[in-house]
Amino acid sequence: DKLNALLIKALVSTGELNEVETYDVDFDHQFLETEKYDAKPTYKKFLGYRPGVYVIGDMIVYVENSDGNTNVRFYQAETHKRFFALLEANSIRVNRFRADCGSCSKEIVSEIEKHCTHFYIRANRCSSLYDDLFSLRGWKTEEINGIQFELNSILVEKWEGKCYRLVIQRQKRMDGELDLWEGEYTYRCILTNDYDSSTRDIVEFYNKRGGKERIFDDMNNGFGWNRLPKSFMSENTVFLLLTALIHNFYKTIISKLDTKAFGLKETSRIKAFVFSFISVPAKWIMTARQYVLNIYTENRAYARPFKTGFG
């Protein structure tokens, strides 16, 4: 909890989070393959851990680790409760919340709904829902990212006493084969309490959640999440949190750095940053009765940050 609090306080201190704005939060579980002493078998058929990760923009704001063999809904509502309590303690407000179907349960949705304006959660389909889907009329054809979809929405009582909007997206099967339950279409549903936005806006907003996979790819390959160093989950959880802290600092630095001068981009991995900006030979030399940092590089971008009155 202290390291998660440090994550958020560091983001507040660097100006990435503030009390004025409201933020969109993404939540997902990342399965990490590792053969550590206490690693458990996951449903993906490898040993590992299953940390739940919260992301705002490109920043990781909260990490809570779990055994690989635990169900994704196991005590998830309590995890959300701790996360939102930490945000609210720092006066950070959440506008919209996105998650996959692992968060689609009455207890979890009720907890999320308390702390955000709108939520968008991939709904798990059930046999009782198909009758409603097949009888729907008024489908609107929309082209999203070059693919033709048909969109619709209905109000459903997903759980007793709880009525939400269900945004439905269907696409004709590419192979032309008929499915036993879905027929000639593939159906995807989004459960939300947003009753004003259009179906297209909701689908497009939810689809942007896929871009957060790039953050996990960066953490796996650039910050060592796919090569955990310790033998036990508690120690590796500390590693996950510390590398998340470094990742956030790196993103802040790279956003304020003149990246082009160093041959970098804002999307450059930390390895490229280290090679271009840090791994440069330098030596303190005495000249004119004072020490001057002599940097051995042809990159003139170093002249500005290290320029002194001497030269």
Task: Tell me the role of every PLM-derived stretch.
Residues 35-41, 62-65, 99, 106-112, ...:
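Short acidic, glycine/serine/threonine-rich loops at helix termini
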Residues 118-221, 307-311:
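An anionic, glycine-rich sequence signature occurring as long contiguous blocks
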